[in-house]
């Protein structure tokens, strides 16, 4: 059934699970937990905060950070390929070419759907004036109401 080489992997997984359960249970039993009104107030560097400390950020910041991480990790793969370019030959070159092509297609797709535009879709088209529209006063009245 189990080869002798698999016992090391099984012991490693069991050891990691035991260590995780042990650390979580130690934190639960040894750590004190008390709630009061003053513990729910944000506090930094000995200075009481003025106003609300919970600032809402736009989702765009999160998306840009995720895109950066994704493209940065893929840059590591390209760097690893660049180090071993002589060893992998033309097969490695074609694989990295396909990989970079997929990256560029995904980047173009993200640009086309407007993921890098900081202006919202509804407000982006309000300021565009159609040059073929004869009655622009009607357009200006509508845009001033918003």
Curated annotation (Swiss-Prot):
Family: Belongs to the complex I subunit 3 family.
Keyword annotations: Cell inner membrane, Cell membrane, Membrane, NAD, Quinone, Translocase, Transmembrane, Transmembrane helix, Transport, Ubiquinone
Transmembrane among keywords: yes
Location in or out of the cell: Cell inner membrane
Keyword Heme on entry: no
GO-annotated molecular function: NADH dehydrogenase (ubiquinone) activity; NADH:ubiquinone reductase (non-electrogenic) activity; quinone binding
GO cellular component, one term: NADH dehydrogenase complex
Main location: membrane
UniProt catalytic activity: a quinone + NADH + 5 H(+)(in) = a quinol + NAD(+) + 4 H(+)(out)
Lineage start: Bacteria, Pseudomonadati, Pseudomonadota, Gammaproteobacteria, Enterobacterales
Transmembrane segments: 4-24, 63-83, 91-111
Function: NDH-1 shuttles electrons from NADH, via FMN and iron-sulfur (Fe-S) centers, to quinones in the respiratory chain. The immediate electron acceptor for the enzyme in this species is believed to be ubiquinone. Couples the redox reaction to proton translocation (for every two electrons transferred, four hydrogen ions are translocated across the cytoplasmic membrane), and thus conserves the redox energy in a proton gradient.
EC number: 7.1.1.-
Known partners and oligomeric status: NDH-1 is composed of 13 different subunits. Subunits NuoA, H, J, K, L, M, N constitute the membrane sector of the complex.
Protein's name according to its UniProt entry: NADH-quinone oxidoreductase subunit A
Coiled coil: none
Gene name in the database record: nuoA
Membrane topology: Multi-pass membrane protein
